[in-house]
Amino acid sequence: MKIAVVGSGISGLSAAYYLSKNHHVDLFEKEDHFGGHSHTIDLNFGAKKVSVDIGFIVFNFETYPNLIKFFNENKIEIEKSDMSFSVSVNDSSFEYCGRGLNGIFSNRFNLINFSFLRMFFDIIKFYKKCDNLNEFNEEITLGDYLRKEKVSKEFIEYHLIPMVSAIWSMPPYEANQMPLKFFLKFFQNHGLFRLKNRPQWYTVSNRSRTYVENILSKISGEHFKNYPVTKIKSNSNGIDLYYGGENEFF
């Protein structure tokens, strides 16, 4: 059977990989690179080249069992990663990192800084409550909930919103508009509300493009990038795939 897979993110790559075991599979990607959220870029620092993942970076064994199985099956090498969080604002006058008391109070002035101490206790209180929060108005946003809980400005602007913005690669105003339900489920499932015993995080050795290239090499058909699919039309014998003013039958 001839099959088309549209999109080369982890869903598209894995679908194309498994279907390729018994069928001819062509892969279509609208972007200029394969991998979707898995995207590695190269930066030059003088004579040194550094490869950086700007999308998919980390995973853990607790919440990514199928991804782990997929990587193991394809002998993708992984290594432990540092999943820490730090903030520095106002020319380092307000800064901390989330690893241990020495990191939290890296600026010793914070020991007597009321604004910082309030943020610190808001973190403990908010995390403890949200880790067990299962009943709530599903229509409200994260910003609505933060206003309802009357947490400090410092907690919102120097902790939670920067963290949400970093995780989902979005500006602060969009982080505030995130549905509370989605935020809670993600943080609960990934152990991000835990103040201790958080899961160990891992990353793909030599960056995520190594796994993308590995899987692409095992897909049976052609790989097309810069090919946005504009329409899929089904008929009694299969489908017509439309792209770039052309169409192809599958």
PLM feature spans:
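Core beta-strand elements of the Rossmann-like FAD/NAD(P) dinucleotide-binding domain
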Residues: 244-250
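Glycine-rich FAD pyrophosphate-binding loop
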Residues: 20-44
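Mobile amphipathic helical/loop "lid" adjacent to a hydrophobic cofactor/ligand pocket
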Residues: 61-180, 184-185
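Conserved beta-strand segments of alpha/beta enzyme cores
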Residues: 24, 51, 77, 221-223, ...
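N-terminal glycine-rich dinucleotide-binding loop that anchors FAD/FMN and/or NAD(P) in oxidoreductases
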Residues: 41-67
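Short loop/edge segments at beta-strand edges and connector loops
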Residues: 7, 80-82, 223-227, 233, ...
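N-terminal Rossmann-like FAD-binding beta1-loop-alpha1 element of flavoenzymes
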Residues: 2-27
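Helical element adjacent to the flavin cofactor pocket in flavoenzyme catalytic cores
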Residues: 185-239
